């Protein structure tokens, strides 16, 4: 009697399909999105990972608000939240926000209350249901009280096999790079910087294997290996 039943995907199951691997992290994000009450998630790890890709996927959600931590200000975010009441607040590189700018999130995330005093006048909103998703390159620069309000996920380094697969699929599928050039780029950059961003830069320019070798030999001689993280 069950042979004709089709398994229906939940609304959030389609998110993160473009991110290779990290299935456990994808599942955690989907569980947070499906939660009846706000659950906040912070992805922490070195640069050159796909942390930002998770936030970019969430930007397609209705009522989402994306913030670059390096340019964010407390006053600007408070003003936006008062005016628009976004359901999802997405903060990339939250560790680059000053402590005074991070602090306003404490009450919002803990109690759903947002208040502000200006020119001796106070305004406040209560029962704000805002999910906060953030990334951090250096979690030590995120206030400890703020860390405690997040479900913190520390990302693990990629193996060579994971780096190779991710780079080749990223270059061939998203950037339309020929497979042989993508493979050569992955192999070469692993020994130089192990940085996916470097692979993308080369993939966008190289039209042949000779181009890959030329770029790497002449312009990446002083690159230092980076720790690339899963996620």
For each feature predicted by the language model, list its residue ranges:
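Pre-Walker A (pre-P-loop) alpha-helix and adjacent loop at the N terminus of AAA/AAA+ ATPase modules
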Residues: 3-40
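AAA+/SF3 P-loop NTPase mechanochemical coupling elements
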Residues: 47, 117-135
